[in-house]
Design a protein with these regions (language model features):
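Non-ligating segments of multi-cofactor redox enzymes
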Residues: 1-257, 263-299
């Protein structure tokens, strides 16, 4: 693949921040609701957004997929969540964790926090914590809502209710600021989740995307598809000089040369931007994501 074509992948990576901002705006398009202290409840809420974004955010244009999934499995008339499961499979098989890197509002929030100029710490020696998000997915998103039910057979959305910091950031805080009744109803659970939010904020300043790496069940779901998704990262080993700049640049602690489509890769493109030989690029369905007379060039 020539240099002209390689630059397309690099440009996508370079404009990632803008793409994240636009995705966050589209996910929360009803901005006037912040001043009204109300939640948008139109037809858009019947559709899930790809990233982690609280249903209760006043500006939210769609439903959170994790919240929607818990609502189904926790229902007193539980049936297999065909729509939500199909949604996960469709996006996972198509994009994998590209969604985490480019389309998730809470991922962008962590990226912005990490830009605050302070000493940064590596998570290289904390890789074991990666598996925590899978435990949270199975226990708090699936098992608890399904098995721990009330007298009429309804289960709580345990992850949203007891763990998710996005709910406090986007939902509880803005709604309480505009509604005295909500402020008066805030209690110990709000305090507990606020502590989680503050902890994630502090950790995000010091470490790169700790919530994505260790806690997020949505990232856990998308990670299952990273190795088979239509969008992938390709390393041209015949061009590689073994400088390891790509692996050093990866803040998700992925060895790019060995496993470019590792479950932890959020496809941010940092490895592409530092490669001196332009040997790393995006592919879609086995074809280069690049220009060649306005067509996709075959691998």
């Amino acid at each position: 693949m020539d240099k002209k074509n390689t630059m397309i992948s690099k440009k996508i990576a370079q404009f990632r921040g803008w793409i994240q901002g636009i995705a966050t705006l589209l996910t929360n398009i009803h901005l006037p609701n912040f001043f009204k202290g109300k939640i948008y409840q139109g037809n858009g809420k019947k559709i899930c957004v790809p990233g982690l974004n609280c249903y209760s955010c006043p500006a939210a244009s769609g439903a959170c997929p994790i919240g929607a999934f818990q609502a189904v499995v926790g229902s007193s008339h539980f049936k297999f969540a065909y729509y939500i499961t199909g949604f996960f499979i469709l996006l996972g098989v198509t994009l994998g964790r590209f969604i985490c890197g480019f389309l998730c509002p809470f991922g962008w929030f962590q990226d912005l926090l990490h830009k605050i100029p302070t000493k940064k710490f590596s998570t290289e020696k904390l890789k074991a914590l990666r598996y925590l998000k899978y435990v949270i997915l199975v226990v708090f998103v699936i098992l608890f809502p399904m098995l721990m039910t009330n007298a009429i057979g309804m289960g709580d959305p345990f992850f949203c209710k007891y763990i998710c910091p996005q709910g406090v950031l986007e939902g509880a805080i803005p709604l309480s600021l505009g509604n005295a009744a909500i402020r008066s109803a805030l209690g110990k659970l709000f305090t507990f989740k606020s502590v989680i939010l503050v902890s994630v904020i502090v950790l995000s300043i010091l470490f790169y995307r700790p919530f994505c790496k260790w806690i997020c069940p949505l990232g856990a779901i998308y990670s299952l598809f990273n190795k088979v998704s239509l969008l992938s990262i390709q390393v041209e080993h015949d061009k590689c000089v073994g400088c390891q700049q790509c692996t050093k640049a990866c803040k998700m602690d992925v060895n790019v040369l060995k496993t470019p489509n590792h479950p932890e890769c959020i496809r941010c493109g940092a490895c592409m931007k530092v490669c001196p030989k332009n040997a790393i690029h995006y592919q879609f369905m086995g074809k280069d994501v690049s220009k060649d007379k306005n067509k996709l060039k075959e691998k």
